[in-house]
From Swiss-Prot:
Family of this protein: Belongs to the universal ribosomal protein uL15 family.
GO cellular component: cytosolic large ribosomal subunit
Subunit structure: Part of the 50S ribosomal subunit.
SUPFAM superfamilies per record: Ribosomal proteins L15p and L18e (SSF52080)
Protein name: Large ribosomal subunit protein uL15
Keyword Transmembrane annotated: no
Keyword Ribonucleoprotein appears in the UniProt entry: yes
Source organism per UniProt: Salinispora arenicola (strain CNS-205)
InterPro entries: Ribosomal_uL15, Ribosomal_uL15/eL18, Ribosomal_uL15/eL18_sf, Ribosomal_uL15_bac-type, Ribosomal_uL15_CS
Covalent S-S links between cysteines: none
Keywords recorded for this protein, A-Z: Ribonucleoprotein, Ribosomal protein, RNA-binding, rRNA-binding
GO biological process: translation
GO molecular function, one term: rRNA binding
Amino acid sequence: MTIKVHHLRPAPGAKTAKTRVGRGEGSKGKTAGRGTKGSKARKNISAAFEGGQMPIHMRLPKMKGFKNKFKVTFQVVNLERLAELFPNGGQVGPAELVDAGAVRKGQPVKVLGTGDLGGVALQVSAHAFSASAKEKITAAGGSTTEL
C-alpha cells in the first residue's frame, strides 16, 4: 500500500487541547489553579512592582526644569573662519555660508569674534553678532547687518 497525504496523522499526544481554566468545579475550575486569596489570586500586579524592592521609577531622580519650545539655537561662525572662506572680502550672508559649507541651511546664523579678519573688509549679514565680532568687522572696514 502506498502512503498518501490523507493517510498521515499526527503522533499520539503531539496535539493536545488548550486547558480551559475556571469552568466548573473540576480540575483547574473555580480558582483556576491560582490558590485562594492574595494578590496572586486576583487580577494582576502593576508592571512597576518589583516585589517590595524600591522600584526604578522611585530610585531615579526627578528631572528638573523644563524644555523651552521657543528656544532659538544658532549656528556659530567665527571671524577666523570667515577670513579663511572669503579672503577677497565682499558680501557674506547665510546663503554664501551654506554654499561654502560653513553652516547648514534652515537654522539662524550667529557670528562670533574668535580670531581676526586680517584686514579683509566684509559686508556680513547674519541673524546675530557678538559685540566683539561687530567691533572687529567694522574696524577692518566692513559692515554688519542683522537679519
